[in-house]
Amino acid sequence: MSVTDIVLIVFIALLLAYAIYDEFIMNMMKGKTRLQIQLKRKSKIDCAIFVGLIAILVYNNVMANGEPLTTYLLVGLALIAFYLSYIRWPKLLFKNTGFFYANAFIEYRRIKSMNLSEDGILVIDLEQRRLLIQVRQLDDLEKIYNFFVENQS
């Protein structure tokens, strides 16, 4: 097994761990999920370029009679990247004490203000950061609003 194969195995393991965390573990952390909203995907073209580059590496490895293990690992990496970018939806998870956005937990008490832009982007101002949240369906903005109104304290 070459160093390349070891590096590919490490990256595949890290991406699988991230996918499992994002899909299953995050839902169980910090209490019950009270509202889940799907967000718009970002940078689809970046993943297409990444998968295309991996396809070129697979082609080069096959044409140069490279190790079959390397080819399988490259294909596995491409499949995981495809899943993370095109099949899995980014999501906003509302819990009792805060919400998960971009895999980070943000407590409600950190919210300084909330605004809605003209093009349907929810802007949440935190202490030192501004979140720009683009929901997949505009009806979800009303669900978020109702959630905050019902759970004010």
Swiss-Prot record:
It is a multi-pass membrane protein. It is found in: Cell inner membrane. Keywords: Cell inner membrane, Cell membrane, Membrane, Transmembrane, Transmembrane helix. Its main location: membrane. GO terms for cellular component: plasma membrane. Coiled coil: none annotated. It comes from the Bacteria. The chain crosses the membrane at residues 6-26, 45-65, 67-87. Belongs to the UPF0266 family. This is UPF0266 membrane protein YE1773. It comes from Yersinia enterocolitica serotype O:8 / biotype 1B (strain NCTC 13174 / 8081).
